[in-house]
UniProtKB/Swiss-Prot annotation:
Keywords annotated in UniProt: Activator, DNA-binding, Early protein, Host cytoplasm, Host nucleus, Host-virus interaction, Inhibition of host innate immune response by virus, Metal-binding, Modulation of host cell apoptosis by virus, Transcription, Transcription regulation, Viral immunoevasion, Zinc, Zinc-finger
Pfam families linked: E6 (PF00518)
Gene Ontology terms: biological process: DNA-templated transcription; regulation of DNA-templated transcription; symbiont-mediated perturbation of host apoptosis; symbiont-mediated perturbation of host ubiquitin-like protein modification; symbiont-mediated suppression of host innate immune response; symbiont-mediated suppression of host type I interferon-mediated signaling pathway
Family: Belongs to the papillomaviridae E6 protein family.
Domain of life: Viruses
Annotated source species: Human papillomavirus type 94
Protein name, as recorded: Protein E6
One function term, GO molecular function aspect: DNA binding
One cellular component (GO) term of this entry: host cell cytoplasm
Note: Belongs to the low risk human alphapapillomavirus family. The cancer-causing human papillomavirus E6 protein has a unique carboxy terminal PDZ domain containing substrate but low risk E6s do not possess this domain.
């Protein structure tokens, strides 16, 4: 499936360039080599993640490995945290114009999720040189209270 010098960066371009439908696409995880399920392929595409090419073969990432990589990266490469105002001061631009991903699931944050960080005074984290926050799904998942 090697595409040469013009290797597609995402699943949709890969399907188009190879002339296959999304439903027929089969990718393995770059970390564990397990074949991705349809749900994992869909999540990978919706999170706007890039394919990894090794020896001319494209790879994605399964849900389990994405979660584990997010945790490992946060623990190993966390640099510092700022409130939104601090991030905007450091970068000299609004967070609404910046690409900020969820540190757990890697989905790009939309305006409402960025606004929530500002309004609820939640910090953004500099991890591996990139600003990361928490998407609405992971925010809810991380703040659910277990009844006693």
């Amino acid at each position: 499936m090697s595409m040469g010098a013009q290797e597609p960066r995402n699943i949709f371009l890969l399907c188009r360039n190879c002339g296959i439908s999304f439903e027929d696409l089969r990718l393995c995880c770059v970390f564990c080599t397990k074949q991705l399920t349809v749900a994992e392929l869909t999540a990978f595409a919706l999170r706007e993640l890039n394919l990894v090419w090794k020896a001319g073969v494209p790879y994605g990432a399964c849900a389990r490995c994405l979660l584990l990589q997010g945790i490992a990266r946060r623990l190993k490469y966390w640099q510092y945290s700022y409130y939104v105002e601090g991030v905007e001061e450091e970068t000299k631009e609004s967070i609404n114009t910046q690409q900020i991903r969820c540190y757990t699931c890697h989905k790009p944050l939309v305006k409402e999720e960025k606004d929530r960080h500002r309004n609820e005074r939640r910090r953004l984290h500099k991890i591996s040189g990139y600003w990361r926050g928490c998407c609405a799904y992971c925010w809810t998942r991380c703040t659910v209270r277990i009844p006693q």
